[in-house]
A protein has these predicted regions:
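Glycine-rich phosphate-binding loops that contact phosphosugars or nucleotide phosphates
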Residues: 1-104, 140, 176, 181-183, ...
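Active-site phosphate/pyrophosphate-binding segments
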Residues: 55-183, 258-287
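Extended hydrophobic-aromatic, low-complexity segments
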Residues: 145-149, 162-164, 173-174, 194-198, ...
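A conserved, hydrophobic alpha-helical segment in the catalytic core
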Residues: 77-87, 241-252
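Alpha-helix N-cap/helix-start and coil->helix boundary motif
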Residues: 46, 143-144, 247
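Short, well-ordered loop/turn and helix-capping segments at boundaries between secondary-structure elements
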Residues: 90, 160, 190, 206, ...
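Structured C-terminal subdomain patch of bacterial secreted/periplasmic proteins
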Residues: 222-248, 254-255
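Composition- and surface-driven signal marking solvent-exposed, interaction-prone regions
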Residues: 150, 198-200, 243, 266-267
Length: 287
């Protein structure tokens, strides 16, 4: 529907790691026909997005590391988007944005190491504490998208239902069906979205839920059964680059505990993979 508002004054950014997601490629073609400036972010030189997009950006990322699909490409995509944002910012602010971005990226490997033991414990907790599902992941502002991404990791590699929701909306919707044995992740850097997410967390702890807290607030971390402490210096704006890591790792260890292969998603099911291609790449062949 948004394509109707695109014209020659518009800038459109398309993202597809394979470069072959049919709807993304269609949107790029339509936007370019309407005269828009289109940037395509992809990790494939042979995909259709790189071929049809007037301004492709190739990430050039190597093969994924051996834990949880879509971790390296997700971080790489976010980094590219932040770089684009910095490039579009006021010249007086650009250098400061790029310095903060570089500092945050330098923290990624440290956070991966720092979160390993806690993520392993959290993943095992799902099994030994008899948790019910779905897994709920709550965030607000920029970190609503982080919550949605975290839910995707549990869906893809653990085969359990997971729901990423905006913190306020959760209070009006999913809360009415949540079981106190459902695990809840709170993605909550200090900033504009923090206070409401913390209030929701306090209520859920009172309700009896186990909280898995990802935050740079000691007060909120103190409320969690499991707490992933994030760097104080990283601002809310840049938090998505780091705050996805604990969920990636927890999903990885939970998947292994279930006896699954976290490196494979559900692609080891040939029929499911076939239908997935029908859904996303326009290959509708029912034979």
């Amino acid at each position: 529907y948004g394509i109707r508002q695109v014209d020659k004054e518009s800038t459109v950014i398309a993202v597809s790691m394979s470069g072959n997601v049919a709807r993304t490629v269609e949107a790029v073609k339509e936007a370019q026909e309407r005269g828009a400036y289109v940037v395509g972010i992809t990790n494939s030189l042979t995909g259709r997005l790189y071929e049809v997009c007037s301004h492709p950006v190739f990430l050039g990322l190597e093969e994924e590391p051996g834990w949880t699909p879509g971790t390296l490409t997700y971080t790489g995509t976010l980094y590219a988007l932040y770089c684009l944002g910095a490039g579009l910012s006021r010249e007086s602010e650009r250098d400061g944005c790029l310095r903060k971005l570089a500092f945050t990226m330098e923290q990624v490997s440290r956070i991966v190491t720092q979160c390993q033991d806690m993520a392993r414990q959290a993943g095992e907790n799902f099994v030994y504490n008899g948790h019910q599902f779905p897994v709920y992941i709550l965030g607000a502002g920029q970190n609503f998208a982080t919550a949605k991404y975290g839910a995707a990791k549990f869906l893809e590699v653990c085969g359990v239902i997971a729901i990423g929701q905006e913190s306020e909306e959760f209070a009006h919707q999913e809360f009415w069906v949540i079981d106190k044995n459902c695990p809840v992740f709170l993605v909550a850097p200090k900033g504009d979205s923090f206070q409401r997410t913390m209030e929701v967390g306090e209520c859920l702890r009172h309700f009896g839920c186990d909280l898995f807290v990802i935050s740079n607030s000691e007060e909120l971390c103190g409320m969690g059964k499991y707490a992933f402490r994030m760097p104080e210096e990283v601002e809310e704006l840049y938090a998505p680059l780091l705050y996805a890591v604990p969920m990636q790792l927890t999903a990885y260890y939970f998947s292994r505990k279930l006896g699954l292969d976290p490196d494979r998603r559900s692609h080891n099911d040939p029929f499911r993979k076939k239908v997935s291609r029908m859904l996303t790449r326009g290959t509708v062949n029912l034979d």
